[in-house]
Each structure stands twice: as structure tokens, then as C-alpha cells.
Amino acid sequence: MDFQAEKQLVLDFYAALDRPQASEAALGQYLAPDFTWRGYHPFNEIRDLGQLASTVWDPIKTSLTSLQRRMDIFFAGRNSLTDSADGSTWVVSMGHLMGLFDQPFLGIRPTRRITMLPYCEFLRIEGGRITEIAFYFDLPSLMDQAGQNPFPPQTGAQMIQPGPQGQGGLLLDSNPAEEGEATLAAINAMIADLGQWQSGLPLEEELARTWHDDMLWWGPTGIGATFTIERYAKQHSGPFRAAFADRAKTNHICRLAEGHFGGFFGWPNFTARHVGGFMGLPGSDTMLEFRVIDLYRREGDKLAENWIFIDMLHVLKQQGMDVLARLETL
């Protein structure tokens, strides 16, 4: 199946949106009147063009001047979780919004230096219009680059997420359907093994079923990146599972793949109860929501790389810590 028209529509949308002082006009040209936009805290859900322009895109472009969109991954496909007869296609984009951090943004003090805001976006296309967007972004990464990291030391390494090994993530041309099917099968197998953390297998053995030994896990600020199954188990997956109980089943809005790339997002993806230890925080009886985007690169029949976006500010706010409000006092 060919998704070239939908890809071109999103590329045209980006070209219009990324121009200075053209936010509402660009949004109105490409978004359907009844669109839904989802973004991380403090933006959450937006369904009004003027609000989306004035609260999200105008402030971003005011704060990050000379803005450039630097994409590392770009692909499209049908949502595997819905009936193919719904007529919609999803386009996925991941990379960084790069600019000069010249004005404050959400209380983050500017540096007047180059900065890169990691983002990932799922866009649903129906009838030549964008009807739904999930725009997830690593706002704590912007804080860290500005010397205002609000988190305690993290278990993984802090860095700007790179694109995929081999730099082949921009799928601007059509790809064989069987490659996307193989990628989706690998992702589904990983999700099935993950389950509710009750596989009964030792963690590293469980991971080795669907991951290459030299896997790369590009985690968000607050958790960090890890390399190899052994270090991923020790530096993220093991500590994370130990810090939570009563994990709900996975709940995705969209899951798709094209070529060697695929991914999913939820709102939320799952809930779990924090028993203590995550990011050095004490436990609580609250069931926490996790809003997540995961993108993957497949090699052979296993997964090789994973880019993860988690709404860390929303997770902490559910535990009584408003990071943005606290930032204003520092």
C-alpha cells in the first residue's frame, strides 16, 4: 500500500508550520475542524486552533528563534489496532526542533545558545486533512540543556538522542509491505513478552527473545539512555519494574510499522502503582498514568533500537510535584 500522498501532506504541513509567525494559518490550512491534539504536560489535550497556536506553537517559535525541524525518522502506515476500512493513515515523525534559546519557555530560563528539543509526532490523515495529532516532546531535556535539570541523578546516560544507526530512518519512498509486517510482528512479540511483567523468565532472558544483545535504548531525560541487554536490565528495566506494582495491560491508540521502523503511542499507555524508588521518590498508593511514545528499528527478526518519550512532568505531577511551578522559584 502506498502512503506517499499522506507523507507529502505532512511534509507540506511542516513547511508551513515551521515558518515564523504563521502558526494559526498553517494549522487552519491542514487540520480538520474537529481535530484532536494531544501533548505532554502542561498542554494536554487541545481541540481549538487558536489555543493550539497561542499556547504551543507561537511560544515555541518565540523562545527558539531561527527554528529548524531536524527529522531523524519518518514513516507511515495503517493503524494495526483498528479496522482497515476506517480509511485513515498515520504518519510518524521524530527528531529535534533546533533553535537559539532566546526567550523564556514555560519558566525555563533562556541561554541564547543553540538548543534541541526532542520530539516525536503521530499524525492521523483522513480525507486530505489531519484529524488527530500526538505531539510528545522531552521538555526536561530542554531544562537540562539550559542547566536547569530538575531531577535527581538518573540511572542511564544523559544525551541528545541520535537518529538510527545507518541514518536510514527517513522513509520518503514506498517500502515493501512485508518489511513493515515483519517489524510489526517483532514489536507485537516484544509487547506480548512484556505483558504485565509476569513472564516468569529472568529479565535478561525475557529481553533476549525479542532484542539484539547490543540493543540501544534511547530513554528520556530523568531515566537516560542504555546500551546492551545487560545494561538496559540493570540501568532501567530492572529498577523500573522494581519500583512499580499492579501494572495495567498495555493500551495503545495507534501501532504501526513501515520498512524497518515502527512504533506506538497511548493516552495513557498503562497505569501502575509506585511502591518507591523511581527517580529516588517515595512510594504512594496512587495509580500513575504513563503517556508514552515508543519507536523501534528492527534488524532481522529482532529489535535493535528504541526511542522513548515519556511525559515525566505528568508522572511527577500525579505524585504531588509540579516541576514547572517549582522551576519558577529557583
Question: Across the structure, where does each feature detected by a protein language model lie?
Answer:
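C-terminal and inter-domain tail/linker signature
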Residues: 1-330
